[in-house]
Structure formats: C-alpha cells, structure tokens
Amino acid sequence: MSQLYQRHFLRLLDFIPDEINGLLKLASRLKATKKKGDETQYLKGKNIALIFEKDSTRTRCSFEVAAFDQGANVTWLGPSGSQIGHKESIKDTARVLGRMYHAIQYRGHGQQLVESLAEHAGVPVWNGLTNEFHPTQLLADLLTMQEHLPEKTLNQMTLAYVGDTQNNMGNTLLEAAALVGLDLRLVAPKSCWPDPALVAQCRDVAQQTGGKITLTEDIAAGVQGADFIYTDVWVSMGEPKEVWHERITLLRPYQVNMALLQATGNPQVKFLHCLPAFHDDQTLLGQQMAQQYDLHGGMEVTDEVFESAHSVVFDQAENRLHTIKAVMVATLSQQE
C-alpha cells in the first residue's frame, strides 16, 4: 500500500478500485493479527489529531483504539476544544496542526471543511464523516460484506439501500458501488434520491468496473435478489420536529421489517446499518418517537430484524476499527 503513503482519505472517488481493494486486504490482515495477538506496530511515535465537531461513538473509539494498537498518540479536539471556524479559520488551524501532528482526522459538517484542511495541513487528512460523505464507514461495510458472503466477490454482490438515500451514506454507497462494481439499488421515494450529478458521475465510473446503479421507488423490485439490505436513520438530531413528521410519514412504507427481507427471495439475506439505530424504545429519543409516531416496533428497522440472525450490524461496527486502522497504516507508513 505504499502508493497511499502521505495521501489524504476524503472521499472514495479519490481512489482507484485497486487501492480500495488493497485497503480491504490490509484491514483483513490487520484484523487477523490483532485477533492472534501478534500485531506489528507501524505507527510508533506518530502523533494524530482527532477533530470532532460532531459527537461520535464508533468513529472516535475506532480511531483511538487503532492508534493505540499501532503505537501512535492521539489528541482529541471536541466541539468545545478547538477554535475552528470561530476564532481561527480552517486554513490557519490546518497549518498549525500540520506542524505538530503527522495526520489529522476530521468529523464535522461540510465536505469543503475537510477539503480545506487537506489543502493546507501538509499532512494526511482523513474524513471521519461530513454532511456529504462517510468513506471510513463504507470500508467497514465492504469488509463486512466480504466476510459474510465469501463465495462471491464484491462485483458479484447486490445491495439494496432502503429509506433516505440522499444523505452521506447514500452518496458514499454510490461511490463505493461504482468503484468495486456492486449492483446497488437505492430504494426510496423520489424526493429522497441523491444528487443527479453524483449519480451520473458514479454511473460513468461503474461502466468501467461492471457496477450497476438503480434508483427506484418500487420496494419489491428494488430488494428482489439482494444479498444485503442496508438502511440508516430517517431523522437526525438538530433537525426541526416538523421535518421529523414529514420524513417519518414519507418513509414509513420503507421500514426494514421481516416482510421486506422475505421480499428479497433470499433466505440468507443480511442486514446492515451504520448505527445508531432506532429499532426499539430503549433510549429517550426512541421512546419519544414511539409515543409520538406509533413506532413501537422500531423506526427505520424493526427490533425483530435488528436482533435476528440476518443482522450483522455489530460485525460491521467492529470492522470500523480494522478498516480505519488500515487507512492510518497505509497513509502513515510505507509497508506493503
């Protein structure tokens, strides 16, 4: 993976298919060595800044544990721990941190912010999530798919993403499908489809890799024959309550339940979710949603599906660690 040394990791379309497949192989190898307890530390003495303008569980833990496993040191800068965009520009922050750290992770708002960090830092910058893209999540998703369907290569797999497909997950799934040749179906109301320009761009790339990208409102047609069903939350914290009502009303027919899994015609279909999920009423927000919108069986996914043998969401969550570690090792060391 020496070709990725000192590279940024901002969005998947910055890479070619061989580079993405190389990262997945590296992640699988790093996972195996960690499980055996004989992991080689490639990042001893490296210092890494973790900027979180949005709260996180999986992303923060994955970056921190990956760094510690590899012998690196981290500094966590939370929403109140830096002056980015308030008293200091992103450009100036990048130039300061680039003098002190070997790499910078950014999880926050607009993609232009992480792009600006990368432009000015002089060290590798990794996108932990922006409003537009979530590339580290997709690496974990692809590794999970390979592990749970080893008899197929990625370009032989079919994935249906059901629900709100115009978010950062929908965008990044498009890019992933184009690069690795997935048969991707985005199953959603037309008003929840992604930006047509991005769809066109990804379809152009998919022509070279054998990928197929379909957008449809037809749930039965969209999930037929799928190897994986994927969904994400319908609403986000901070959105107005009026938006919640509109979104839930619009997307209720697209809930992932057992009937939808059965509609795939594939008894071995697996369920993916990037988490957190509103699958029950065991959280304060889940209770509020259940009472207000009569969603006692779950929102975007039912508890029955989430807790079933179809669900591989916790393997998926664990793989955040191994794939993020692969990005760190590939961009900060020259080992093959």
Curated annotation (Swiss-Prot):
Gene3D superfamilies the record matches: Aspartate/ornithine carbamoyltransferase
Involved pathway(s): Amino-acid biosynthesis; L-arginine biosynthesis; L-arginine from L-ornithine and carbamoyl phosphate: step 1/3
Keyword presence, Transport: no
Localization in the cell: Cytoplasm
TM annotation in the entry: none
Superkingdom of the source species: Bacteria
Protein EC: 2.1.3.3
One Pfam family recorded for the sequence: OTCace
GO biological process: arginine biosynthetic process via ornithine; citrulline biosynthetic process; L-arginine biosynthetic process
Reaction(s) catalysed by this chain's protein: carbamoyl phosphate + L-ornithine = L-citrulline + phosphate + H(+)
Key words of the record: Amino-acid biosynthesis, Arginine biosynthesis, Cytoplasm, Transferase
Molecular function (Gene Ontology), one example: amino acid binding
Binding site for carbamoyl phosphate: 56-59, 83, 107, 134-137, 274-275, 320
Family: Belongs to the aspartate/ornithine carbamoyltransferase superfamily. OTCase family.
Protein's job: Reversibly catalyzes the transfer of the carbamoyl group from carbamoyl phosphate (CP) to the N(epsilon) atom of ornithine (ORN) to produce L-citrulline.
Protein name, as recorded: Ornithine carbamoyltransferase
Source organism: Erwinia tasmaniensis (strain DSM 17950 / CFBP 7177 / CIP 109463 / NCPPB 4357 / Et1/99)
Protein's gene: argI
